[in-house]
Amino acid sequence: MTNTIDSFQKGSALENYNIWIDCDPGHDDVVALTLAACAGHCKILGVSTVHGNTTLEFTTKNALAVMELLNQDVDVHAGAAKPLMRESAFATHIHGTNGLAGISLLPDYPKKKATPDAVFAMYTTISNYPEPVTLVATGPLTNIALLLATYPSVTDNIERFIFMGGSTGIGNITSQAEFNVYADPEAARLVLETKSLIGKLFMVPLDVTHKVLLDANIIQLLRQHSNPFSSTLVELMTVFQQTYENVYGIRNGVPVHDVCAVALALWPSLWTSRSMYVTVSLDSLTLGRTVCDVWSQQNQYPANVHVVLEADVSLFWETFIGVIDRLNYL
């Protein structure tokens, strides 16, 4: 298996990264945002929200609340409230109606307001920023598809586009499809077919996120932290773990899908990928399936995506706990 990620490491695991996060918070989105906020070598340029785990109203409110609790002076921009061509599909069976079921420690009424300009804000910020930008998406790809369709030149200043989604095998919302891709398959297909992203596009699929499991030992380590936000992390991950056990029967830990996407952006050497051709099925039986040419058998279709398949799990959690220590200084 070829590691195609180290070439983006720029010589140091602590090289500064400029990132924009497009998200649909969501329990694991909250942890992903926390990781980015606590990493000393990361500048969050902006946060945009999209339909997904719940409605846009709640994903936006949740993002605002997290940024406030983390003392982050980062603007939140509301994006697409529905898919490009279909009715919305929400993950309320996992995240509850408000996206953060069972969580009581986030502000009910965030002080800042979001602006309804996600696509334009992404374009102007990324295009005008004096350094290359890493774009990370942890929800359905509706905002990203609209960005690429409306402002195709934006890819000139995108160093990497990393999205959590897809699978080379089974799904988690249907037998065939992973939720983020299923929630807007047309958007995902448009993104994957964007030629100007070839070489920059990274998919973080279920294959690898189901290897990075947050278990009782990690939760116990989080309990030992004295800062207030650690209590929020413990609460939300405990609820998330219980839900996964009830819905999927997974008892040895909960996959932190979206955290993996942010961690790939910030610590590239922890991950191993394979370049392959990937597209999205729009057929009714396999709707939302990411069709992956793992063994390069379809020679007429050149590789367009770096698909992340392996992680250094022990080093991941060691890094994660070390970064969360910085919560005391936010």
Swiss-Prot record:
Entry keyword NADP: no
Keyword Hydrolase assigned: yes
Alphabetical keyword list: Glycosidase, Hydrolase
GO biological process, one term: purine nucleoside catabolic process
SUPFAM superfamilies per the UniProt record, alphabetical: Nucleoside hydrolase
InterPro entries documented for this protein: I/U_nuclsd_hydro_CS, Inosine/uridine_hydrolase_dom, IUNH, Ribo_hydro-like
GO molecular function: nicotinamide riboside hydrolase activity; nicotinic acid riboside hydrolase activity; purine nucleosidase activity; uridine nucleosidase activity
Residues annotated as the enzyme's active site: 257
A GO CC term attached to the entry: cytosol
Family: Belongs to the IUNH family.
Name this polypeptide is given: Uncharacterized protein C17G8.02
Organism: Schizosaccharomyces pombe (strain 972 / ATCC 24843) (Fission yeast)
